[in-house]
Swiss-Prot record:
Residues 103-121 have a biased composition (Basic and acidic residues). Pfam families: CCDC106. This is Coiled-coil domain-containing protein 106. Residues 152-168 have a biased composition (Basic residues). Signal peptide: none annotated. The keyword Ligase does not apply. GO terms for cellular component: cytosol; nucleoplasm. It comes from Homo sapiens (Human). A motif (Bipartite nuclear localization signal) lies at residues 151-164. Keywords: Coiled coil, Nucleus, Phosphoprotein. The lineage of its organism: Eukaryota, Metazoa, Chordata, Craniata, Vertebrata. It comes from the Eukaryota. The modification Phosphoserine is found at S130. Residues 63-101 form a coiled coil. The gene is CCDC106. The keyword Zinc-finger does not apply.
Length: 280
């Protein structure tokens, strides 16, 4: 009896144990279904060779960009210079056309005089051929009128020639031969530029080419801004070098500090805002 009761108890205990299994034990989860979403640090770690090549590429791109910007600014200045030269040439062409028209009009005005004189002489000779005395008087009157018209025509020619060739000597183009001449011409053009507020009109007023002034500008700027550097460059000797070579040496003598002063004076219109024709 005791054995049967113990078996029944164990069976009951077993049954209760089997029923309580799903509630007491934790569910078994497969660890393979969980994946890490955070990236590994090893994936972002690049080799040192790749990093150095990328840095070199960025430096080269920056250098090319800087060179492109400098070239763009130089081209912009060149365009402005060419536009001013174009305006100057247009003014010269307009002046030439207007002077040619005036000469043609003067020529046309002076031409009909002899024709009228010939017509008057022919009419007087043909209309009164029957009367010798009247014919002679008409011929003498025609000759007097012809001589008077001839004198007027000569006076007109003389006045036109004086107007054509009587240009003031101050407006004639002069060739500078030394540094003092370059400085004197530069100051004259600068004064005209400050009055007229136009580079092309200032060059036209003094009958000087823009490129000629630009090639000798470093000499004048060195004498105005930094005359103490003239000892480094030396005096100009026409027997040893040309004026263009001396101007290039003056350009190379302009250091960064002097160039900053020059640019500041150009912005304030105290120097001619003209670009250099030399390169370092």
């Amino acid at each position: 009896m005791n054995d049967r009761s113990s078996r029944r108890r164990t069976m009951k205990d077993d049954e209760t144990f089997e029923i309580s299994i799903p509630f007491d034990e934790a569910p078994h989860l497969d660890p393979q279904i969980f994946y890490s979403l955070s990236p590994s640090r090893r994936n972002f770690e690049e080799p040192p060779e790749a990093a150095s090549s990328a840095l070199a590429l960025m430096n080269s791109v920056k250098t090319q960009l800087h060179m492109a910007l400098e070239r763009n600014s130089w081209l912009q200045k060149r365009i402005e210079d060419l536009e001013e030269e174009r305006d100057f040439l247009r003014c010269q062409l307009d002046k030439f056309i207007s002077s040619a028209r005036m000469e043609a009009e003067d020529h046309c005005r002076m031409k009909p005089g002899p024709r009228r004189m010939e017509g008057d002489s022919r009419g007087g000779a043909g209309g009164e051929a029957s009367d010798p005395e009247s014919a002679a008087s008409s011929l003498s009157g025609a000759s007097e009128e012809g001589s008077a018209s001839e004198r007027r025509r000569q006076k007109q020619k003389g006045g036109a020639s004086r107007r054509r060739f009587g240009k003031p000597k101050a407006r004639e183009r002069q060739r500078v031969k030394d540094a003092d001449g370059v400085l004197c011409r530069y100051k004259k053009i600068l004064g005209t530029f400050q009055k007229l507020k136009s580079m092309s009109r200032a060059f036209e007023h003094h009958r000087v080419d823009r490129n000629t002034v630009a090639l000798t500008t470093p000499i004048a700027e060195l004498l105005i801004v930094a005359p103490e550097k003239l000892a480094e460059v030396g005096e100009f000797d026409p027997s040893k070098e040309r004026l263009l070579e001396y101007s290039r040496r003056c350009f190379l003598a302009l250091d960064d500090e002097t160039l900053k002063k020059v640019q500041a004076l150009k912005k304030s219109k105290l120097l001619l805002p003209i670009t250099y024709r030399f390169k370092r």
